[in-house]
Amino acid sequence: MTKNIKRKKTRMALLVVLLALILAVLAVVCVYETELNKLDSNDGVDNSFYDSQFSQFKDKKIMVIVPHEDDDLMAMGQMLPQLYKNGTDVRIVFATNGDKRVSAYTRQTEACNALEKLGIPREKVIFLGYPDGTNMYVKKAGEKSYSYSTGLDHTYSGKGFREYHFQKFGTHAEYTVENMIYDIENVILDYRPDYIIAIDFDPHTDHRGVSMSFETAMSRILKSENDYQPKILKTFCYSSEWKAKPDFYSLNIKSVHKPIKEKLSDPTYETNVPQYNWDDRVRIPVYKGSVSHSILRCPEYKALGEHLSQFAFVYSDRIINGDMVYWTRRTDNLLNDASVSVSSGRAELINDFKFVGVKKIKSPHAKLSGCVSKFDKNDAEKTVTVKFKHPKTISCISLYDDFDLDSNITSGILSFSDGSSINVNALNGDGSETKVVFAPKSGITSFTFKVTGYEKSAGLCEIEAFEKADYDPGFSLIKLKNADTDDYIYNYFIGPNEKSLNLGAYVSDQNAEFSIKLTDGEGVKLEGNKLVFDDGFKKCTVRAELNNDHSTYDQITIERLSEKGLRSYESFEKVNRILFKIDSLRLKTKNIFVNGYFYETLHKFVKNALKKVGINIK
């Protein structure tokens, strides 16, 4: 009897302890969630880019073209879901099956699951079905390419999926670069998107190959479909995301910053495409609901977590940023309706919509080739002749010099069919755009560009001619930023001793004028574009608008943290880092069992353990 009473008391005590532990855990969770909600509060934060009432993208069509199943999230994962929710029709095109080490079924299932996490249904996804990690893009005609995992030499898809070529033509396409170009061309023309987001020339085999294939396909489309001129934005997934600095954990969200030189294919330039200047990038703000002070709350992290086989979630602290960065490729080039000839060199390279190319596609630091038309040194003329099929009105010509820093065109002359001419000074030696703007010339049937001076050798990558010098990107945008750090601002926190904040603004139309004003808040004043805080400041709201279009706006909040609040945040950040590591471990463990990597993981563990004691297994 006494023993039973003791057992009951012991059980009761254990239950009480367990209940106390549960209550303690719940209390900690409640405190954590409360603090997180305070930090993440975006009341008062808004941007017209995502305004559902005045959506610029409602009933518009966007197509994303990327190599692998997960690149879509890096290309526009923080932007696309809200645009889709606001009425934009989207298509995500995956060029390869991502099947070098993992099955196509696994990659395709992960991609669909990830997009569904963001609210984008499976029917919006298109798989082209080409192989992953091959040098198919630079092989000569007749040379075969095969899938590493299946040995197939033609497009295919995982169980339950159908690749694009088979759906459209009823047959599989042989693995050739020409077939990929053909499929990209067809999928674009089938859908005719208003906007195309495409991968750019990352130091990765498939990223380079798909970028070059897309540009070739686009060149063919623009030359055959003169009435179709989509807005094109190209983006990098490696230098600005996958291999960027892991800077998620900070008091305020960081924007994408200039790539680390050592991470680039050629550190001579600012990006992996020499023609791109960092300051010319297009900076799209992310939707306010896509960021949180806890990475586990970010929708993109949840989507990346579906890509178990790629461990994409591990890089979330690099991928999730305060903006998304692109470069515009204009499609209104008048040379698309013209013939081009040269006194020497390769005329086809001058208007092929392609800035860069490479032969050794697998080498991260391979020398760029096949993209510059070089004049023979003995050529006394060194002239490009452009003849239009129909008379044109021209107000701007863009010249792209050979990006070899030692080979520069130092002077030239543009001559037009109306008898006029323009002297051209030295072109930008890094190959970036040299824009020659002039009063509109009407009825132009042809023009020439003659090199009159050069260093080492003379060559041109591209020539473009436009009716209008300024380009309409297809949307209107303004976004406030920290003028000192260049980071975009959303719900922004300042420390207890900060007395001012210099504001700047990114505007999609660089010629547009804008105004910044305080809409509420005490203890703060606006001096020009500088916010000045006094000791009593707590919180304010700031709004920026275009002067000629008040429907294009941005609104942010600024809040001061006390000493206690700042210490609390620092502790909070440490907890978040730990939670991120724990959840990453959870997802890695899940991958071992879901994708059958148990023995592969065990093998790596044993191999690394033996390596530490000096035993190397090849």
Predicted features along the sequence, with ranges:
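Short, solvent-exposed loop/linker segments at beta-strand-coil boundaries, enriched for Pro/Gly
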Residues: 512, 516-524
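Active-site beta-strand->loop->alpha-helix modules in alpha/beta enzyme cores, enriched
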Residues: 10-20, 24-227
